[in-house]
From Swiss-Prot:
It comes from Actinobacillus pleuropneumoniae serotype 5b (strain L20). It catalyses: uridine(38/39/40) in tRNA = pseudouridine(38/39/40) in tRNA. The gene is truA. SUPFAM superfamilies: Pseudouridine synthase. Formation of pseudouridine at positions 38, 39 and 40 in the anticodon stem and loop of transfer RNAs. Belongs to the tRNA pseudouridine synthase TruA family. The active site is at residue 51. This is tRNA pseudouridine synthase A. Substrate binds at residue 109.
Length: 262
């Protein structure tokens, strides 16, 4: 049978999602816990391979197993064998043609900025601290230049392995919740570091160093060296993955749970 899981994790102490030799990854910890429940080796496939320090509240994985377990056992049993910073949120049996990555039609990320003069000792690895005042409204206006299908070479990491820089951004919203600025972006897919590169360029606009039209200009240049540096990893969350309704993938609160809109 094939099982899909919803996964939440704090990526602070992991070297990204993907299993690697000699370093700890989220995938490694999850597979070890699932293998205990299944009493057999389990390999998982994820919707999005997040980088070192990046978090997930809406990650989706699937795996195949011959072990017959109640769905709640894949949740409670796995959680009992996971570290505190990784958790299974739900489990469903899915059809054989489901694939966590290739069946996905969209992914959604949130980047959380703690915009305050002084840093906080709470959630130091769960938000990115920027001490200078940011105009979130200008950031939002600038972000609208990125909507639709475009060549995102200006916001693509040099080591990106994707065959094409073209992506389709469905929405990009910037809002303020108290001292938190939330950059919420959804696209069919993302090139490597795309969200973090966009965010740091939007911060340039929010701080007043660049006009809102600068984002439109950057997009047209298709040159990564002209955009801002890559934003810090700790503010980024994979919050949702979209699938066709026929797969029956549950919908949950986007997170992270400290935001008021949850």
């Amino acid at each position: 049978m094939k099982i899909a899981l919803g996964i939440e994790y704090d990526g602070s102490r992991y070297f990204g999602w993907q299993r690697q030799d000699e370093v700890e990854s989220v995938q490694q910890k999850l597979e070890e816990a699932l293998s205990i429940v299944a009493n057999a080796p389990i390999e998982v496939f994820c919707a999005g391979r997040t980088d070192s320090g990046v978090h997930g509240t809406g990650q989706v994985v699937h795996f195949e197993t011959q072990a017959i377990r109640p769905l709640q056992s894949w949740c409670f049993g796995t959680n009992a064998n996971l570290p505190d910073d990784i958790a299974v949120k739900w489990a469903v049996e899915v059809s054989e043609d489901f694939h966590a990555r290739f069946s996905a039609t969209a992914r959604r990320y949130r980047y959380i900025i703690f915009n305050n003069k002084l840093r906080s000792a709470i959630l130091p690895k769960g938000v990115s601290h920027y001490h200078y005042a940011l105009d979130h409204q200008k950031m939002h206006v600038a972000g609208q230049f990125l909507l639709g299908e475009n060549d995102f070479s200006s916001f693509r990491a040099a080591k990106c392995q994707s065959h094409t820089p073209w992506r389709n951004v469905h929405h990009l919203n910037v809002s303020r919740l108290g001292n938190y600025i939330v950059v919420d972006i959804q696209a069919n897919a993302f090139v490597h570091h795309m969200v973090r590169n966009i965010v740091e360029s939007l911060i340039e606009v929010g701080q007043g160093r660049q006009p809102v039209e600068w984002i439109q200009w950057l997009l047209a240049q298709r040159d990564r060296t002209l955009a801002a540096p890559t934003a810090k990893a700790e503010g980024l969350y994979l919050v949702d993955v979209h699938y066709p309704e026929r797969f029956g993938i549950p919908k949950t609160a986007l997170g992270p749970l400290f935001l008021a809109d949850n």
